[in-house]
């Protein structure tokens, strides 16, 4: 159940990117995109009293090799940059599925 959370991207852009973004990750990790969630958190970063146009993409999923994480980051970054965002930070969090519950 990969969970992708974006920050610093307009929700309209996330909506437009959603199909290609999830299709890309689906292909790389060989998991159906129906198992993914994609969220857009509207946020603004600041540096020295000015807005800093930074984008963060957090991918939470079960442990995967660093090479797979790098491949995903390298595949999705240009998709986001094509929307006009210059700095994109992609990071990964490992979920402990034994401690995840749906009640």
What are the roles of these predicted feature ranges?
Residues 1-103:
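Interaction-mediating elements
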């Amino acid at each position: 159940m990969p969970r992708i959370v974006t920050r610093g991207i307009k929700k309209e852009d996330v909506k437009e990117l959603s199909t290609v973004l999830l299709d890309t990750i689906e292909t790389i990790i060989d998991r159906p995109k129906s198992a993914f969630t994609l969220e857009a958190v509207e946020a603004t970063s600041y540096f020295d009293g000015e807005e800093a146009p930074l984008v963060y993409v957090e991918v939470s999923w079960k442990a995967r090799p660093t090479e797979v994480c790098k491949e995903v980051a390298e595949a999705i970054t240009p998709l986001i940059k094509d929307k006009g965002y210059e700095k994109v930070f992609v990071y990964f969090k490992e979920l402990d599925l034994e401690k995840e519950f749906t009640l």
